[in-house]
Amino acid sequence: MQVVCGLDCALIYSKETAKKKEKKDIKIKKDALKPLSYYVKKAEKICNEYIRARDANLPCISCGAIDAKKWDAGHYISVGANRTLRFNELNIHKQCSFNCNVNLSGNLINYRKGLLKKIGQEKLAWLEGWHEPEKMTKEKAMSVEKYYKEKLIDLKKGNHG
């Protein structure tokens, strides 16, 4: 199958193809230089967006507020305490930003009470238990980002399964 109409078009097509390949190669090289933290932040951003959308019609997990100006995706077990639970949906819930998540450092006593109601004793006990540390990689972070992008799209379309 012929892609171009003649020699002049072939030269132009060849140059454009080479430019596209060069741009793609540069992008691959730039991406390889980005640190792991770049990919983790991107994954966490979309994960948190998903959690806020998932819990949009629910009150703050800690204080029950429904009218906060800003909402966070608050972690019951902090990322600093256990990075393995950073993207675990049982560990992340909608939380009012200024009062509970910032001023009260997560309002953990009331967060735990809210979790007990929401996920039950068995899952809460699992969450509070020991978890094998996992090494985060760029590939895993990119996979997490893709996973939550897809879940967010499905949620917005109304596909909750």
List the predicted regions and their residue ranges:
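Short Fe-S-cluster ligation motifs
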Residues: D31-Y38, E89-C100, Q121-S143
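Short Cys/His-rich Zn2+-coordinating modules
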Residues: V40-E49, Y76-N82
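Short metal-coordination and nucleic-acid-contact micro-motifs, chiefly zinc-binding Cys/His arrays
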Residues: M1-C5, A53-L58, N88-I92
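Histidine-centered nuclease catalytic patch
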Residues: I61-I92
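A boundary/linker detector
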Residues: M1-I46, P133-G161
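Short cysteine-rich loop/turn motifs with clustered Cys
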Residues: E44-D72, C96
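Short cysteine/histidine-rich zinc-coordinating motifs and their immediately flanking basic loops
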Residues: M1-L7, E16-K23, W71-V79, N107-G114
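Short Cys/His-centered divalent metal-binding micro-motifs
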Residues: D8-K15, A68, N91-I119
